[in-house]
Amino acid sequence: MRVVLQRSKEASVTVDGEIVGQIPFGLTLLVGITHEDTEQDAAYIAEKIANLRIFEDENGKMNHSILDVKGQVLSISQFTLYGDCRKGRRPNFMNAAKPDYAERLYDFFNEEIRKQGLHVETGKFGAMMDVSLVNDGPVTLIVESK
């Protein structure tokens, strides 16, 4: 499992001209799932993200987690994170999980984040989405389970 995490001042996701998910501030997650991922991978990353100290304290040091600052999460499914661009000019997406498996694990992942005590907004799995955000910092990290 691979998640691109962006600390965001605000973020939203739109499908067919309608906002389907929106947060005032917190983390925007682009979530990629491969066919080898399990619920254990999803739970590991959910716990890791909830407790990563990437928000600044009063001294400007990254000492607070999203739980500490009472932020929210915007989670977006993103199979293209497993695009392999090493050969040719078109990405190969064979490492991305099949949609039915990926959707189930994506839903499980979002529930695991909620179990950590966070409010989670999502996009629409499998849809073409427009994602807007104001990246805070910018702070962008890649979190992987393997």
From Swiss-Prot:
Native source organism of the sequence: Bacillus cytotoxicus (strain DSM 22905 / CIP 110041 / 391-98 / NVH 391-98)
GO CC term, one of those recorded: cytoplasm
Pfam family, one: Tyr_Deacylase
Lineage start: Bacteria, Bacillati, Bacillota, Bacilli, Bacillales
SUPFAM superfamilies cross-referenced by the UniProt entry: DTD-like
Enzyme Commission (EC) number: 3.1.1.96
Top EC class of this enzyme: hydrolase
Biological processes, Gene Ontology terms: D-amino acid catabolic process
Subunit structure: Homodimer.
Sequence motif Gly-cisPro motif, important for rejection of L-amino acids, location on chain: 137-138
A Gene Ontology molecular function term of the record: Gly-tRNA(Ala) deacylase activity
Catalytic reaction equation(s): glycyl-tRNA(Ala) + H2O = tRNA(Ala) + glycine + H(+); a D-aminoacyl-tRNA + H2O = a tRNA + a D-alpha-amino acid + H(+)
Keywords from the UniProt entry: Cytoplasm, Hydrolase, RNA-binding, tRNA-binding
Protein name according to UniProt: D-aminoacyl-tRNA deacylase
UniProt record similarity statement: Belongs to the DTD family.
